[in-house]
Regions:
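Self-splicing inteins and homing endonuclease
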Residues: 1-31, 76-106, 119-121, 144-148
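Short, recurring structural edge motifs at helix starts
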Residues: 26-30, 55-58, 100-103, 125-133
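C-terminal structural cap/anchor segments
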Residues: 31-89
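Conserved phosphate/oxyanion-binding catalytic-loop motifs
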Residues: 36, 108-111
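Short helix-capping/linker segments at secondary-structure and domain boundaries
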Residues: 45-52, 119-128
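Short active-site-adjacent structural elements
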Residues: 61, 89-90, 97-99, 110-113, ...
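Structural signal for terminal/edge beta-strands and the immediately following C-terminal loop/tail
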Residues: 123-148
Length: 148
């Protein structure tokens, strides 16, 4: 269920459910490629495969984000592969996902991807989380505040 409550004049997005992350099948992200790493962090826990397509251009960002996402998903025990124009993430039992030292490749989106994984996988260590300063100068403080 998705709702948009307003608290103290600020509108929020609130999502509730049974904890199941549903795979998306083929999902075209042509118009929203920047969210691919964050979406990938969620889809690692999905019940069905997802092909994120229309994002081949992510190979030319701060790092080759498609290659980096595949490497890091595999590092935690997940299954992913590059597609000609995107990324496929296959479901695995969540108990097979494990701790790891996650590389950020000096890429702020990869750092947020890794920190999101740490919400569900214990003992994820993010190497160079400070790279998030590019878009969120106080990311670490905001993250710690959210978890407090």
């Amino acid at each position: 269920k998705v709702s948009f409550p307003t608290i103290d004049g600020v509108r929020y997005c609130e999502v509730t459910g049974d904890g199941t992350v549903r795979g998306l099948g083929s999902f075209d992200l042509t118009a929203a490629g920047e969210i691919a790493p964050s979406l990938a962090a969620i889809l690692v826990f999905a019940d069905k495969p997802t092909d994120m397509v229309g994002i081949g251009h992510l190979r030319g960002h701060e790092t080759n984000r498609l290659e980096a996402l595949v490497n890091e998903i595999r590092r935690i025990g997940g299954v992913a592969e590059e597609l000609p124009d995107g990324l496929r993430i296959e479901p695995v039992p969540s108990e097979t996902l494990h701790e790891a030292n996650m590389e950020t490749y000096a890429d702020h989106r990869m750092a947020t991807f890794a920190t999101m994984l740490g919400l569900r996988i214990p003992d994820i260590q993010v190497i160079n989380v400070a790279t998030t300063r590019k878009t969120l100068p106080d990311f670490v403080g905001m993250w710690n505040g959210m978890l407090a």
